[in-house]
């Protein structure tokens, strides 16, 4: 082991690793994340990826960048506490969407679009927090269709998606130009690894 560490130290390019990192992440890092996201069913490129210090940081950045004080976002009746904190801090109102079979219903989403003036939708399709429900493929397609019709910004929190043994396409794969897709290493590798990536629409 001692010899191995000595070899590693000799191979390290200290001049490179002790420099400031690139603001939007190193290209090799983003290419690796793009491959990881592809395994979850979403084709993206390194140019479409932005780094964040964990999933919560990604959510705050998205809300602050794409929404304004007073905007409304649809959520599950029971949703991730972190988005409640972020929305409250930014003056964004969260609107619970009626469910059917433990996931957002078509009726509920249509009602919110027509009557609640929602600008966006926050979802956790795989192992939803706190219910752990996995959204059906039909449910994902339905959300994409309605979001497209009403021009909603969909925030797809996919931090658990790679843990799903049954492959289900993400909403972003059906609605790539209106979906902000979040993936994080904190849940699938280690909590102390505070690294998330946001896959953004090309346009």
Where on the chain are the PLM-derived regions?
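N-terminal basic, amphipathic alpha-helical segments
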Residues: 1-6, 198
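Active-site PLP attachment segment
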Residues: 172-203
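Conserved core of the PLP fold type I
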Residues: 5, 10-150, 155, 161-174, ...
């Amino acid at each position: 082991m001692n010899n191995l560490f000595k070899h590693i130290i000799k191979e390290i390019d200290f001049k490179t690793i002790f420099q400031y990192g690139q603001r939007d992440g190193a290209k090799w890092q983003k290419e690796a994340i793009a491959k990881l996201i592809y395994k979850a069913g979403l084709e993206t490129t390194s140019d479409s990826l932005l780094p964040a210090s964990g999933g919560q940081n990604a959510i705050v950045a998205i809300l602050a960048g794409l929404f304004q004080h007073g905007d409304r976002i649809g959520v599950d009746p029971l949703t991730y506490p972190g988005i409640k904190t972020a929305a409250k801090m930014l003056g964004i109102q969260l609107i619970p969407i009626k469910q059917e079979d433990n996931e957002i219903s078509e009726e509920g989403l249509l009602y919110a679009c027509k009557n609640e003036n929602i600008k966006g939708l926050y979802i956790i399709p795989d192992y939803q927090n706190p219910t752990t429900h996995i959204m059906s493929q039909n449910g994902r397609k339905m959300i994409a269709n309605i979001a497209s019709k009403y021009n909603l910004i969909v925030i797809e929190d996919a931090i658990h998606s790679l843990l799903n043994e049954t492959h289900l396409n993400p909403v972003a794969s059906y609605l790539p130009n209106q979906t902000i897709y979040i993936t994080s290493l904190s849940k699938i590798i280690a909590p102390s690894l505070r690294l998330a990536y946001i896959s953004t629409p090309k346009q």
